[in-house]
Amino acid sequence: MASNDSWAKTPAQPKRVGLFGLVCLVISAMLGGGVYNLPQSVAQGASAVAVLFAWIVTGLGMLCLANVFRILSIEKPELKNGIYSYAEKGFGRFMGFLVAYGYWVCNCFAMVVYAILLPSTLDLFFPGVFGDGTNWASIALSSGITWLMFVLACRGAQSTAIINAIGTIGKVVPIVLFILLMGSCFSGDFFAQHALGSQGAATLERAQFFDQVGSAMMITLFLFIGIEGAVVVSGEAVNAKAVSRATMIGFTVTLVLYVLVSIVPYGSFTQDEIGAMANPSMAALLASHFGLWGALLVNVGIVISVLSAWLVWTVMLGQMPFYAAKDRVFPQVFCKENRVGAPVPSLLATTLVVQGLIVLAHFVQGNAWQVMVNITAVMAMPCYLVCSFYLFKLALRGPWSSCVRRSTGLAFGLAATLFSCYLIYEANIELLVVACTIFVIGFPIYLWARRKEQVFTKSEACLAVIIVIAAIVGICSMVGLI
């Protein structure tokens, strides 16, 4: 009789994801449901000119970050799970654990954003059933979809890449149609007249303008989480060159779509009008010009967008504990695969965490969607910082090939490091406390994985103590004990 322990077998010839599949993965990971409310989100606090300025700053910063992942995929093609493996290679196993765990938890929260957005969108079709996306009907629907994504992800990265390619095309088409339809109503004179918002050039002060830019950047920065998508599954890619090209192509396409979606409405609506639009604002804008069918088009796009991104993140998150376990910073149980190379225990753990967070969202006070978005953003930034600094360190004094100039790697590494530091500096202090607390909750996972070996070096022990103290002091301060 054949053995049933197929999880322990590593497939000899796993199927690989090609350039098109990787590009779709990057686009789908970044182009989530947030794009459908982008016009209203940025217009609530920024004029057209401020939004353009925010996109310039964000675009340059994220271009540097995209090049960090592009160059690292070329210089270190043997590191098959980018975000984690770069941290572990550059700064030791404990830092590797922090990035692996932080990135994993961060995007578990991001998946809960999808779990809230989807039923709240469907409430337009079934009024009163799903509400704001956190009632028990919503939880039941989102839970069912979460486990369906688990089943699909267990079929392997290549199988899900095909589904994701179809989903990516399905989500991009409504966005392109929105840009074309709103572009047909665009008035250059109207745009110029209202470019600085309701205050106008006469009364707008410089400090107010940069406050508007900062407000818009809080939205634009969150939208780019997922830029590392091709790197995270680089172990499943046909080659390192495909990973590099997919990262840059996906970034460019997504940036162009984001800029056009956020700017084109200013050609026929004022800032105040766009900021007052109902969620999702893309649907409300089209409905204002073209009637109900415009809103229907966008809502269908949201459903496709969320389902596609949900699947992508399930696959990506399944890779993180798997590769971390191979380097003994996660428990060895996560090393197991099924016969098609899918890391089933890792996928199962991800699904269970997401399931728990979906239920938790029901009890969150206030806007649960915004809470999940904020936690996702603050947990992602340290991960990007570590990868950026690793490239800077590597280009400064590490081994280097002739494929990319060392000075190029040094410049992009330094620029992305400074950009990531700025993002962390701008984060809300309460969110940083939450991040430290989440890291501390994960420490037992690392202790379990390293129980038979040296757990910490001296510097790692100091870092762990600092994180614990920061979490304790922050919590005590928030509850008024100090």
Question: Where do the PLM segments sit?
Answer:
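Hydrophobic transmembrane alpha-helices that form the core helical bundles
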Residues: 43-44, 54, 63-146, 150-154, ...
